[in-house]
Design a protein with these regions (language model features):
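Acidic, PIN/NYN-like endoribonuclease modules and their adjacent C-terminal/linker elements
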Residues: 2, 109-150
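Active-site neighborhoods of divalent-metal-dependent phosphate/nucleic-acid chemistry enzymes
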Residues: 78-124
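Short, flexible helix/strand-to-coil boundary loops that buttress conserved ligand/catalytic motifs
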Residues: 14-15, 51, 131
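Alpha-helix/helix-capping structural signal
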Residues: 8-9, 42, 125, 142
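Short amphipathic alpha-helical segments and helix-helix/interface helices
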Residues: 23-28, 70-73, 107-108
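Short, well-structured N-terminal submotif of metal-dependent ribonuclease cores
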Residues: 1-39, 57-64, 148-150
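Helix-adjacent hinge/juxtasegments
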Residues: 53-85
Length: 150
């Protein structure tokens, strides 16, 4: 099994939102079972930007902010494989009329490029019309229920 994680799932955990504990349990399970887990390079850029804003809101300033951000991002790089797509996949994503949110289309293309079986996202409704894909779409709660919960 190969699992692709949408940006919103990582940010849910980093920002300690509603499903942070559940997502932490999923990440622990994936790690303990040595399941390859992927992020898109676009997600990494977005996580960098949003994490910097979060750290700033917590009162950190440079250079401490930059040091903490680097530490966080190195941890993410250690835990995830990074899927980077090229112009062919981007064009396919831009052209996919099943999506009204093109960023989600790029995420699906990144997951497909990495040969992932599963995509975990908080916004499953954004993927409801992607019938051409072999990738199964799960919310964190559904993934936990189907794979982890006894």
């Amino acid at each position: 099994m190969k699992v692709f994680v949408d940006t919103n799932v990582v940010m849910e955990m980093l920002d300690s939102r509603n499903e942070a504990d559940l997502i932490g349990s999923i990440f622990d399970w994936l790690d303990n079972h040595e399941i390859k887990t992927y992020l898109s390079v676009g997600s990494f850029y977005t996580i960098t930007y949003l994490s910097e804003r979060l750290l700033h809101k917590q009162g950190l300033t440079r250079p401490q902010l930059t040091g903490k951000l680097r530490e966080l991002l190195i941890g993410i790089i250690d835990e995830f494989q990074i899927s980077s797509i090229g112009s062919k996949e981007l064009l396919k994503g831009v052209s996919d009329e099943q999506f009204t949110d093109l960023e989600d289309s790029y995420q699906l293309q990144s997951a497909s490029y990495a040969d992932c079986d599963i995509l975990i996202t908080i916004n499953t409704k954004d993927f409801k019309d992607c019938t051409d894909s072999q990738i199964k779409i799960y919310s964190p709660r559904l993934f936990f229920k189907e794979f982890i919960e006894e």
